[in-house]
Amino acid sequence: MPRHVLTLNDLGEEGSWLLVQQARGIPDAKGRTDFMTERTAVLLFAQDSFAERLCVSAAVRQMGGSIVFQGATGGWKSEVERYQRQMLAVIDYFVDCMYVYGIPGLATKVDRDLVQFPIINAGSPDARPAHVLADVACMLRYTRDDLKKARVGWLGCTNGTLFSLIEGLRYFPFSLQVALPPLEDRPTLETYARHCGVKVDFVDTPQQAVEGCNFVYAGCRSGLDEEMSQQWKVDDALLAHAAPKARVLLGTSPMQAIEVASDILASPASLLLLQSENRLRVHKRLLHWVFLENERAI
C-alpha cells in the first residue's frame, strides 16, 4: 500500500523522530541527488502559497524529479472531490506522487483505498506536518538535543501549524502554551488537545503565552483588525517576558504572520532562514519515506 503523510499520525513517533534526525543529517540542504529521477510529482494547490510551492518544487527538482503544478483555478478541486475514484485513477496514470495544499480535513477526505500513489500534505488549515518536523529540528539545535528544555509559546490565530504542534506533543517532549485572540475558536483546539491526549496551557494574553519561553511563535494574524494587530505583535517589550535569548519562529508566511519587529527579524533571535532550510531538508526526507517502502525490491 502507498504511504501517505497527511498528518504526523501517519508517521507515528518512530517515523517522526527518524525524519527529523535524517533531515538534520543532510550535509547540504540544497545538495542534488538522483532519487526522484524519472519520477513526477503533481502539486495541487487549492490556495496560493509562493513559499510552499517554492520549497516543494525545490525538493523534488534538486532530487532529479519533475513537477506538474495546478493552482486554485480550473475547478479541479470540486472535480476530484465529486469523482474521487475516477480522477485518482487518471492522476495515477501520469504521476508518481502528489502534494496537496490548502484543503481542510484532507486526512478524512482522502479515501486511502482508492489511492495508488503517495500523497503528502504540503499544508492545510488543520495540519502542517512538514513545518512542525522542520521546527522541531530548529529546537533541537538550540536545546542541544534536549527537547525537554524547549518551552514553546504561540500567540496569534489558529492554522495548520498550531494543530500539528499540538499533535506533535504526542511524540516530542516540548511544552506548549497558547494565546488566541478573543474571536478565535479556543474550544475546538482544547477538544483537539484532549483528542491527542496531550497537555496544552491555554492562556489569555500574548505576555502570558511567551512567559518563560525559549521559543516564541508568531502565529497567523488573519482574524485581527488593525487595532488588535498592534496589541498582538512580537517586539522587544513582549520578548522581555520570554526567557533570555528566546528564539522567534514564524507559524506561517511573513505576510500572514503576527507582526514581528524588523530589528528582531534581522537579528540572531529570528529562525526564519533556518526554518526554511529545515523545511527543504524535511521534504526531501519525506520523499524518501513515502517511496522506499513502496519499492517491491526493498
Give the positions of each predicted feature.
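A short helix->loop->beta-strand "cap" motif at the edges of active sites that frequently abuts
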Residues: 115-117, 174, 241-247
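Rossmann-like adenosine-cofactor binding region
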Residues: 195-270
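C-terminal helix-to-coil terminal segments
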Residues: 266-298
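Active-site cofactor/substrate anionic-group-binding motifs, chiefly glycine-
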Residues: 40-94
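Positively charged, low-complexity intrinsically disordered leader regions
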Residues: 1-54
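Anion-binding alpha/beta catalytic cores of soluble intermediary-metabolism enzymes, centered on
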Residues: 88, 96-168, 250
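Glycine-rich phosphate/diphosphate-binding loop of Rossmann-like nucleotide-binding domains
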Residues: 46-59, 141-218
